[in-house]
A protein has these predicted regions:
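The serine-hydrolase catalytic nucleophile loop
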Residues: 8-21, 35, 172
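Hydrolase active-site cap/lid region
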Residues: 89-140, 156
Length: 230
């Protein structure tokens, strides 16, 4: 069972293919969500905040455990782009998550690069997602967006796939986060790839990182570069 979390300007439907879905082909059920602040959530008065994402994990897992077809010992999380941050916070604060895999990272504490050096539409959208109209107040809020003090609690397998030249979240922040973790973890870096991992030889030719074994019984090739695991 995978809880799939989209990015900042994405939506839950994009995470589940109508045919040939990679999770479903492996016999893994998918719950694709719009979490706090994502897509239609602001229209319902549910905005991005650290506390809302901390609370999201128990709410989602409790709902899943109410379904008899779900194996409560094998609930994982996947996240892409800003979903990498949201999924990390959810995992850190929900011990029933068995494994987590994220890609195309947004893991810079405070999010300075994506909000101040990239397209201004990113900041404008996130202000709407978090219910801010005053930019100065939003800038103070953005400082609270951090994995620091959270990832240290993650004890289950964690996979992160990043582009070496990520222009929205410098790689150094992802590397620092991985060093701060104490559980089993793997960092895969694709040479020359930007934020959206792919369309470079390293990503197109592989090898490709394996899915966390706690979610999939099918082994895959070894990853290109990995961090030490504990």
């Amino acid at each position: 069972m995978v809880i799939a979390i989209p990015g900042m300007d994405s939506f839950k439907e994009v995470n589940v293919a109508l045919a040939n879905d990679r999770w479903m082909q492996r016999g893994v059920a998918v719950l694709s969500i719009d979490g706090p602040g994502q897509y239609e959530s602001p229209l319902l008065g549910v905005y991005v905040s650290m506390q809302n994402w901390i609370d999201a994990g128990p709410a989602v897992v409790d709902w899943l455990l109410g379904r008899p077809e779900i194996d409560g010992q094998k609930i994982g999380v996947s996240g892409a782009s800003f979903g990498s941050f949201f999924g990390t916070i959810l995992t850190a604060n929900e011990p029933r998550i068995a494994a987590t895999a994220v890609i195309s990272t947004c893991l810079e504490p405070g999010c300075h690069t994506i909000f101040e050096e990239a397209s201004p539409t990113f900041k404008k959208r996130f202000m709407w997602m978090s219910n801010y109209t005053d930019e100065a107040k939003f800038d103070e809020f953005a400082k609270t967006l951090t994995w620091e003090g959270h990832v240290e609690k993650i004890r289950t397998p964690y996979l992160v796939v990043a582009g070496e030249a990520d222009e929205l979240s410098p790689l150094e922040h992802t590397e620092r986060m991985v060093r701060a973790m104490s559980g089993p973890r793997q960092l895969v870096i694709y040479a020359d790839s930007r934020h959206s991992v792919g369309n470079v030889p390293a990503a197109n030719l592989g090898p490709f990182p394996p899915a966390p074994r706690s979610l999939s019984p099918k082994p895959s090739a070894a990853a290109k570069r990995t961090s030490p695991s504990s």
